[in-house]
Amino acid sequence: MGDILDYNTTALFICDPQKYYLDRVGGIDVIVRNIKCLIDSCKELEIKTFMTKHNPSIYDEIIEELEPSNHPVFEKTLYSMYTKDLKKNIDELYNSNVRDPTNYLRTVILAGFETHVCIIQTALDLIREGYTVHVITDATASIDSLEYTASLKRLKQSGVYLTTTEAVLFQLLRDDANPKSSKIIDLITNRSISLPSYYKEDEYGVQITHSKSN
């Protein structure tokens, strides 16, 4: 079953993009650029963004390039973004307009850290609540590459769509005639990513090589 994204009914969830991971995840600069591209593109498309930070006394604060300018950050200890506070915020933003087909939350784009812990538990919580979930494989990571790959398999088994930063943004645009098209394409192009240096390909397509030892 296919699912075409509509930016009127989509939100971006960025999970725990914290400084703890900067010297622990291989290819972290690529992942940060992709997350930044998602945040900036969703801002341009007027898609709501929600961000969490996990137990900052251990995992430090948000990576500087990703510090929020116009979206909330929810502090948590739960291994899922779908906390009571975040759910309450979603209910306040969307439920009063539930009868408006252009302003309800149907689909979540999910990126951040770590794939096998908070990403997978967030995705499963959202699916249980009836949302469609798209995990951005080149904008999420685990410190251990084996955990990352195994988690993608589990996500796919659970009905999560696995996609990439560029693919999901073009799906949101839908048409070159979209007045936002030029700006979004610029954001995609300006990531300045060197594919041979950071990516490998397997059954899920192009992915980051995460482990420092790879």
Curated annotation (Swiss-Prot):
**Gene3D superfamilies referenced in this protein's UniProt entry, alphabetically:** Isochorismatase-like (3.40.50.850)
InterPro entries annotated for this entry? Isochorismatase-like_dom, Isochorismatase-like_sf, Isochorismatase_domain
Which residues lie in coiled coils?
none
> Per the record, a Pfam family?
Isochorismatase
Q: Can you tell me which family this protein belongs to?
A: Belongs to the isochorismatase family.
Q: What is this protein called?
A: Isochorismatase family protein 2B
- State the species of origin: Dictyostelium discoideum
